[in-house]
């Protein structure tokens, strides 16, 4: 069951506007997975390079075809719109913001509860700001896109507020990974080591901001563990919905933590994957890696013995085992997290790919 399916089953209109990238075959589009409507792209943003590439070879492979912006509604086949090239790349985030605002207004006018999901396509490569923002910061295209995104998110907030829905709307801003790990990327991960496609904190830590006036305390900052999969049971709790009892749900209900009823997160641990590779686990402020990543490329290093980081002592992950010999007891809870996860995979392997 998806988040959109759970919300739809509980009376919410559901719309996605932006990048899907979770399947682009019949039965796997967002409107097959709980969303009522969708406008966006089905694959990754880098495909915008292809139509403008002098070396692109048409017919080289059945899957090596240009991406199109797509639109679909539940119960209908998606339709292809314009080619997703560099020109469209620069304007698509404006378009999906407008689609989302229109969706919100339509549902508000009907007094219908809604779930609007906007997976923006920026700042993945190619980083192409809208013409309205190109050159506005004086600090290059990446900074222009940050300013652009700030404005677009502000428009969404303003829409909610002007419709009188502020107190009744949960607004979340977050990301799915740290900066893109390519030399041309100008993303920034602060003091954290690594980038996307690495097992380090620069990949795992992302911003998470949530607004729900009167329910979630304002101006509160926390360093507690929180995983995006926690949103499923947490949002279900917020709306009083039941979650399935016939399968393992990896997320934990964080409603008490977010609403200030508990200072501690309900999550004690998480597992670290890159693709299908299990790299390690985190438990409280401790981290154990059984594999590491070559930071000059994407080579995987299998460790003869796991590396252990105390992230309170070594937040930059510079010195494995720093002060670790005094605390080898932590091996037991760290290994237990990994064993529990492996048990859950064996006992509930999930839905097979079609």
Regions found by a protein language model. Name each.
Residues 1-306, 311, 315-354:
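Formylglycine-dependent sulfatase
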């Amino acid at each position: 069951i998806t988040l959109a399916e759970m919300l739809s089953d509980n009376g919410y209109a559901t719309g996605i506007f932006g990048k899907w990238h979770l399947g682009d075959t019949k039965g796997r589009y967002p409107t097959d997975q709980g969303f009522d409507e969708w406008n966006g792209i089905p694959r990754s943003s880098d495909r915008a390079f292809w139509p403008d590439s002098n070396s692109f070879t048409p017919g080289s492979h059945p899957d090596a075809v240009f991406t199109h912006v797509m639109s679909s509604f539940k119960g209908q086949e998606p339709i292809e719109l314009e080619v997703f090239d560099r020109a469209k790349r620069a304007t698509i985030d404006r378009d999906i913001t407008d689609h989302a605002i229109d969706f919100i207004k339509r549902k508000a006018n009907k007094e219908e509860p809604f779930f609007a999901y906007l997976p923006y396509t920026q700042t993945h490569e190619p980083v192409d700001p809208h013409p309205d923002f190109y050159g506005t910061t004086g600090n290059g295209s990446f900074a222009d896109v940050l300013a652009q995104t700030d404005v677009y998110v502000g428009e969404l907030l303003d829409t909610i507020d002007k419709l009188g829905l502020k107190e009744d709307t949960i607004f979340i801003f977050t990301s799915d990974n740290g900066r893109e790990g390519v030399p041309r990327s100008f993303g920034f991960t602060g003091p954290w080591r690594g980038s996307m496609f690495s097992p380090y904190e620069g990949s795992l830590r992302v911003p998470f901001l949530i607004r729900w006036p009167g329910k979630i305390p304002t101006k509160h900052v926390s360093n507690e563990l929180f995983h995006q999969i926690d949103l499923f049971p947490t949002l279900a709790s917020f709306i009083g919905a039941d979650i399935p009892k016939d399968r393992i749900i990896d997320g934990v209900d964080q409603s008490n933590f977010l609403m200030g009823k508990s200072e501690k997160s309900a999550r004690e641990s998480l597992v670290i994957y890159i693709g299908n590779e299990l790299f390690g686990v985190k438990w409280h402020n401790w981290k154990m890696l059984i594999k590491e990543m070559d930071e000059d490329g994407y080579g995987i290093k299998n460790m003869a013995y796991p590396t252990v980081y105390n992230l309170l002592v070594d937040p930059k992950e510079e010195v494995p085992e720093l002060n670790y010999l005094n605390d080898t007891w932590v091996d037991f809870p760290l290994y237990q997290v990994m064993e529990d996860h492996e048990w859950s995979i064996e006992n509930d392997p999930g839905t097979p790919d079609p």
